[in-house]
């Protein structure tokens, strides 16, 4: 327990971090730092809204804050949007494209992404419809990027979103 909540580190987190360091992939280390700042935004707003964190999990896909505190829908929105807001502010201050990408990704209307969770607070059905439309568009974009740029990055993100959005 750290600061009153559990810090859980999956082995996959250390494996990915080790590969990043070995391969000199500073961008992965940067991504983890920006993801940590993103989660710190959620955590800060959770504390401001009177909530208490249960755990922070580190894994191959980044960091995830878990909490069981019951908040009003408005406070929950503040908590959910605080993370992307951190990335937007970092982008505006430092013109770092990775923070812009994190902001855009987290503002997609797909559950379990932050903005998808905001929508689901108010309408489960709308959340599912917007999520499906967004996923179809993302699949098309991912295939295009794979064919034209030989880039697999969006494929991985889309697979993650499909797996988690259909389990909700």
Language-model features and meaning:
Residues 1-168:
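Hydrophobic transmembrane alpha-helices and their immediate loop junctions
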């Amino acid at each position: 327990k750290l600061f009153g909540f559990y810090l859980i580190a999956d082995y996959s987190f250390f494996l990915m971090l080790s590969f990043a360091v070995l391969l000199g992939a500073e961008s992965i280390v940067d991504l983890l730092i920006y993801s940590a700042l993103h989660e710190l935004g959620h955590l800060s707003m959770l504390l401001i809204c009177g909530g208490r964190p249960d755990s922070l999990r580190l894994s191959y896909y980044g960091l995830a804050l878990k909490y069981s505190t019951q908040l009003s829908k408005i406070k929950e929105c503040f908590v959910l949007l605080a993370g992307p807001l951190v990335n937007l502010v970092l982008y505006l201050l430092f013109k770092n494209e990775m923070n812009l990408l994190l902001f855009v990704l987290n503002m997609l209307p797909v559950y379990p992404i932050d903005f998808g969770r905001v929508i689901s607070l108010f309408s489960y059905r709308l959340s599912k419809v917007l999520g499906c439309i967004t996923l179809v568009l993302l699949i098309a974009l991912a295939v295009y990027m794979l064919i034209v740029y030989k880039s697999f990055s969006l494929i991985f993100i889309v697979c993650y979103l499909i797996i988690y959005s259909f389990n909700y």
